[in-house]
Regions:
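N-terminal Sec-pathway targeting helices
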Residues: 1-14
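Solvent-exposed, non-transmembrane regions of membrane-associated and secreted proteins
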Residues: 20-256
Length: 256
């Protein structure tokens, strides 16, 4: 009888070990695959385009930035490229209005992955553009995707990295960080700031109220603010010090 119990326990542990090993192998395979894919995309972006190749028209007034044109032809859900120096944040940014959260669990190649790909909230208009462009990205344990935003919790990092780059398909853009804060979502708690609900300001007061709340919650004073008429960029990722926590970096456009 004891031998049967012992064998059953060994079998159970073996099954658990096999399943756990399978998950780990899958995770590391996915990690390596995603890293290789994005490294290849970065190589395209950082390679000088051929001078003989004419850029495509994006609209009647604008043409594609050549290196982004090539990626757009691979996946026309691409709306831009984001980069933060001294982090792993160097990625295409996607938007799928028909399937808003598609890139939460799909990569640039549209294949399923836990890593996802940074993406713009569906009600943000990249063409106008909206007053506030909100981009989401996962906080991955290997430091990829938007995990690098965690560095902004340290004021000394911000002091050396006061701007982020977010290019559209047609314009190179630089944003200046105005606030970095932690909040919670999916709750009616008074600690919850629904920053993701602010996309367009109907009045000067709406815009000012949003910016003031961001500044009030900021982990430190950047000495920078924004005024009605400025264009904002809000970067959001998970923050694990509390349930449903988020770390948010808000910046304003300073060139286009």
């Amino acid at each position: 009888m004891k031998n049967k119990i012992y064998i059953a326990i060994i079998c159970a542990f073996s099954i658990v070990f096999a399943v756990s090993s399978g998950f780990l192998i899958k995770h590391y395979y996915d990690s390596a695959k995603q890293a290789e894919m994005y490294d290849n995309l970065i190589e395209v972006v950082e390679t000088e385009p051929e001078e003989t190749k004419e850029p495509m028209n994006y609209s009647e007034e604008k043409t594609f930035i050549p290196e982004y044109q090539e990626l757009y032809l691979q996946n026309n859900d691409m709306v831009g490229w984001i980069k933060v120096e001294d982090t792993k944040i160097n990625y295409p940014v996607m938007q799928s209005k028909d399937n808003p959260n598609f890139y939460l669990k799909h990569g640039f190649d549209k294949a399923y992955t836990d890593y996802g790909c940074p993406y713009v909230q569906e009600n943000c208009d990249m063409e106008l553009p909206s007053d506030n462009i909100i981009i989401y990205g996962h906080h991955m344990n290997d430091g990829s995707m938007f995990a690098g935003l965690m560095k902004f919790k340290d004021k000394s990092f911000w002091e050396k990295h006061k701007t982020v780059s977010f290019d559209t398909l047609t314009d190179r853009q630089t944003y200046e960080v105005i606030a970095v804060f932690k909040t919670v979502v999916y709750t009616d708690s008074p600690d919850s700031f629904k920053y993701y609900q602010f996309v367009n300001a109907e009045t000067d007061e709406d815009f000012t109220s949003y910016v003031e709340k961001c500044k009030e919650l900021s982990l430190y004073d950047t000495g920078v603010t924004a005024e009605y008429g400025d264009k904002l960029l809000t970067l959001s990722t998970c923050e694990y010090s509390r349930t449903n926590g988020r770390l948010v970096v808000v910046a304003k456009l300073i060139n286009e």
